[in-house]
A protein has these predicted regions:
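Rhodanese-like catalytic fold shared by cysteine-dependent sulfurtransferases
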Residues: 1-29, 36-69, 76-113
Length: 113
């Protein structure tokens, strides 16, 4: 369910389990907005990368019909990315609640970037 995003626009919180299921069945394109050093240390397999520090909504990868969901370390930067995307006219409001920390807490795998 959509609610006001603290950084502007709207936000919809998805659980790591919802995101994992959506990635597995091809409905979700996860975009990790953490910085390159964080990605090198650990990442979610299959996630695309676009650091928030260089975020450009016009340069988002082609989702090929999938829902774009933003992710970060804990869930703050992903909400900021959604707000930036909405401010540029894109209707992207989904993020993974808890970020990669929530993903790992749910017992899902990560890999070295």
């Amino acid at each position: 369910m959509s609610e006001p995003n603290p950084f502007g626009g709207r936000i919809t919180h998805l659980t790591p389990a919802e995101v994992k299921a959506g990635m597995e069945d091809g409905r979700i394109l996860l975009i990790d907005v953490r910085e390159p050093d964080e990605i090198r240390a650990e990442r979610i397999p299959g996630a695309a990368v676009m650091a928030l520090s260089a975020f450009d909504a016009a340069a988002l990868p082609d989702a090929q019909g999938k829902q774009i969901v933003f992710s970060c370390r804990s869930g703050q930067r992903s909400q900021r990315a959604a707000a930036i995307a909405q401010a540029s006219g894109q209707q992207l409001e989904q993020h993974m609640q808890g970020g990669i920390l929530g993903w790992k807490q749910a017992g899902f795998p990560t890999e070295r970037g």
